[in-house]
Amino acid sequence: SDLKTVNLSVVSVAFVGSFVLGGLLILFKNKYPGVSVEIHEGNIRELRAGLLDDSIDLLLETAIPAGDEVERYLYDYEQIILAVPAEFEVNKKLRSFQMAFAQARDGAFRGKDVQPVPMQAFRDCPFIFLKEENDICMRSRGICRNAGFEPKVELFLDQIMTSFYVAKSGSGIAFIRNSLLSLVSDTDALIYYKIGDPLARREIFMTRKKGRYMTKAMEAFLRLCHIRPEKPIE
């Protein structure tokens, strides 16, 4: 009854929003049809600025460090996996580590039944990376270095979906979110591998400006996400 004529602005970094926020919006609108909800995507610098100038209520993100200006609530985790061109010779000796498309897409590999691939097997292969400012780029490089080699990066790209399609063309190995596979069709052109490095597991946060008044709409949206508004991460 308190949420009949209010507005709520929820935004996210690109791709995370298209995959996650759409479903949440449907649930929220069904429960609170009177709330006007704006959902946008953008780059992390613009979105952080919007959060701090109060034009954005809640931000779904993976890369803003905790600090004096924001409060973060853990929403979920995502897994980074390898997408390797099927034509690469290295795949022949790694058959026991390969995942089926559905297995990779649905996260069924998270248990112990699927073994992580030995990353050092790819030391001589070309890689497709996201650009340096992207958190996945930093994680990708760290995963390779932790395996004892410096990756041979052929190309730096802006979007993770583009890196998927470039890998599909055979140009190099891409680090992708496993949830991306829910947005594409199965293909024989790629083979998927689990990564054992802790850097491959990434937190997704719902973030708000610290000290800002928590509206009933914001509180309701957080609770819909199974988040306790009074319990931000310290």
Residue ranges and their predicted role:
Residues S1-S9, S18, K29-N30, P65-Y73, ...:
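Short helix-loop hinge/linker segments at domain boundaries
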Residues G23-L27, R45-A100, I191-Y193:
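Short beta-strand-centered segments that line the small-molecule binding cleft or hinge
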Residues N7-V11, L59, I128, A174, ...:
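Short, well-ordered beta-strand segments
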Residues L3-Y32, S36-A49, Y213-K216:
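N-terminal winged-helix
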Residues A63-I64, A86-E87, R177-L180, I204:
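Short secondary-structure boundary segments
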Residues V90-K92, F97-A147, M214-M218, L222:
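Secondary-structure junction motif
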Residues N43-L47, L52, T62, E132-L190:
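Hydrophobic hinge/microswitch elements
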Residues V20, T162, N178-L180, L190-I233:
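A late-sequence structural motif
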